[in-house]
Amino acid sequence: MPTKARIRLWSSNIDSLNFVVNQIRNMAQKTGIQVSGPIPLPTTRMEVPVMRLPHGEGKKKWEHWEMKVHKRIIDIAADERVMRQLMRVRVPDDVYIEIELI
């Protein structure tokens, strides 16, 4: 039987991500479960250069748009009670969660 749950979280909004991470950590600490993390992973930076003029005539001026994706990993003991509470955590729309039993 798996003894740990690895929770991967990622979002482009770091405030929402930290809010969910704190909820999970506080929930695990209240139940007395061993928690390791949150472990910050490298931030992925995606940049898209877009030409300002749609028709391409004149000087070529570019706008640069970027999006940063922040990632965290939390390892907790996989107890049935904790996993049920984990499913009840309110998650904003811009935070994505993946749970893996290891």
From Swiss-Prot:
Entry keywords, A to Z: Ribonucleoprotein, Ribosomal protein
Top-rank lineage group of the source organism: Archaea
Xref: SUPFAM superfamilies: Ribosomal protein S10
UniProt xrefs under InterPro entries: Ribosomal_uS10, Ribosomal_uS10_CS, Ribosomal_uS10_dom, Ribosomal_uS10_dom_sf, Ribosomal_uS10_euk/arc
Pfam families: Ribosomal_S10
GO biological process, one term: translation
GO cellular component: small ribosomal subunit
PROSITE patterns cross-referenced by the UniProt entry: RIBOSOMAL_S10
Gene Ontology terms for molecular function: structural constituent of ribosome; tRNA binding
Subunit structure, interactors included: Part of the 30S ribosomal subunit.
UniProt xrefs under HAMAP family: Ribosomal_uS10
Family that this chain belongs to: Belongs to the universal ribosomal protein uS10 family.
Function: Involved in the binding of tRNA to the ribosomes.
Name recorded for this polypeptide: Small ribosomal subunit protein uS10
Organism, scientific name: Sulfolobus acidocaldarius (strain ATCC 33909 / DSM 639 / JCM 8929 / NBRC 15157 / NCIMB 11770)
